[in-house]
Design a protein with these regions (language model features):
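Membrane-interface amphipathic segments in extracytoplasmic regions
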Residues: 1-339
Length: 339
């Protein structure tokens, strides 16, 4: 837990970071208030540069952590468990991510896939959501290959042991963030031009930066065409690019495209994608498609794993949208690149 506690002694703040719940954003806020970055807008800092310039509790003894918590305002953000699990899968295994393919993907193909090919076992680049859920449940029961992007919210931040002053939710992230910045008297130090549009542009930039930063490792397992298409599909799953805006490249036109050209095409696709309200349907459809692939027994096992998070943070153990997902018949398939 210690490494998740981000501390700012000057402002007497403690933030417990939970992966897949806006933690990259809040780490950039802490870079600003610590003076590490001389900007006021967190979105001016590249997401891939958000992992330095602030203090964590990792090397601190528990008595000192206890003292800091007593002197500070503390907060966490949580997220609906089924949506968070899918987000972790999309970001770390479905989208191009050679590091997670090597560490988690290969483990999954070797342990949860019948008749896996040697390429599957070597690369781990084509994991299905059902295979991922099998791995997640197994890792929780056996403490093998567990990863912070997937383990439940409560395991990160021990909310039964630490009485956090504020608990925000990703479902109301903008509203809760602006409230917190005002409440903590940080609104003069941290400012935005347009929170929502900057969030979406940030996601586009990060998707491009990440796939190009790992290009050499990724192309050992798939072509760059396939990798860039998956990054595009990830943005569609997130509701940033409409499902109605077709992928702008062919295999031939894309062969030597630069990162700047790719970003410009992503931004152009986003500009053609309509309102955020219309794009929200993408997220629900992708959720239904993913969970429709789980057999009933696996879904019930998963329900047991998310039960504590659901009860602690006022979510449903098995929402109707998840329980009835197997009845869903998609007209547009977000995960068809794995077929």
């Amino acid at each position: 837990m210690k490494e998740h506690l981000t501390i700012d002694k000057k402002h007497k703040l403690v933030y417990c970071a939970i992966e897949k719940i806006g933690c990259t954003f809040w780490k950039r806020v802490f870079q600003i208030i610590s003076g590490f970055k001389n900007v006021t807008d967190p979105f001016e800092i590249q997401a891939i540069r958000a992992y330095e310039g602030y203090l964590t509790a990792k090397g601190l003894p528990f008595d000192q952590i206890h003292f800091i918590l007593k002197q500070s305002k503390s907060f966490i953000f949580v997220r609906e468990p089924y949506e968070r699990l899918l987000s972790g899968y999309v970001d770390k295994l479905f989208a191009p991510n050679a590091a997670y393919w090597a560490f988690i993907g290969t483990f999954i193909t070797q342990n949860f896939r019948q008749n896996a090919t040697e390429q599957n076992k070597k690369c781990g680049h084509d994991i299905t959501f059902a295979e991922f859920v099998q791995y997640f449940i197994h890792s929780q029961h056996n403490n093998l290959r567990r990863d912070a992007h997937f383990v439940p919210n409560f395991e990160h931040c021990r909310p039964c042991e630490i009485d956090y002053d504020y608990i925000g939710k990703l479902e109301t992230f903008e509203e809760d963030t602006l409230f917190l910045l005002t409440e903590l008297q940080l609104d003069d130090k941290v400012k935005f031009t347009n929170f929502q549009s900057e969030t979406e542009r940030d996601a586009i930039t990060d998707a491009a930066d990440y796939v190009y930063s790992m290009r050499r490792a990724i192309t050992k397992c798939m072509t760059m065409h396939e990798a860039l298409f998956r990054a595009y599909r990830k943005l569609q799953i997130r509701g940033i690019i409409s499902k109605h805006v077709p992928y702008p490249f062919t295999r031939d036109s894309q062969r030597d495209i630069t990162i700047d050209e790719y970003k410009q095409e992503l931004l152009a696709a986003h500009a053609q994608s309509g309102t955020s309200e219309s794009r929200k349907a993408n997220r629900k459809e992708a959720l239904l498609e993913a969970y429709s692939t789980l057999p009933d027994d696996l879904l019930q096992q998963l329900r047991a794993e998310v039960k504590i998070d659901a009860n602690l943070f006022d979510y449903e153990e098995l929402p109707d949208v998840i329980r009835t997902a197997k009845e869903y018949k998609p007209s547009f398939k977000y995960f068809d690149v794995l077929m």
